[in-house]
Amino acid sequence: MIRKYGNILEQFTTPDRDKLLVFTANGVLDRKGRLIMGAGIAKEIRDKYPGIDEWFGNALIRKSNILEKVITYNKEEAHAFHFNILRGVYKGQSICALQTKLHFSNPSTLELVSESLERLKQIVFAYKEVHLVMPGVGHGKLPLSRILPLVETLPDNCIVWSKRDMF
């Protein structure tokens, strides 16, 4: 694993199937079936790749592993999915959702982050480079001291990004 500081998205100016862009995610879909991507790197990804929230939502619906019904921020019923990682190619870019929390309003859990990183390790060698943000520490509210030992087990083709002066 290599640590870098800066903006992860600056590495993705043109689509590249050999570089996997990993973002941290929750498992909640809105009433239109779109993955809720309203904060942090997920929001940045949603803004950079319009329609990706619907694309991931459709993928989760096809996967059909609804864990529980939940009430979203606007009091509408939605579904929460447990998926660990979900990947594909969107508009020419290899991209992966790494689940760090079940519901967007809750903090990340160390167990889910660990489980998702283990699943990620199973697929990283299919890519020249794998770029991800430090999982679970921003909006996930987990201490960096608990996450670092997990990400340090990632292979050297994995680049873990933090914004300068954050982690």
What annotation goes with each model-predicted range?
Residues 1-167:
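Macrodomain-like recognition of ADP-ribose-binding/processing modules
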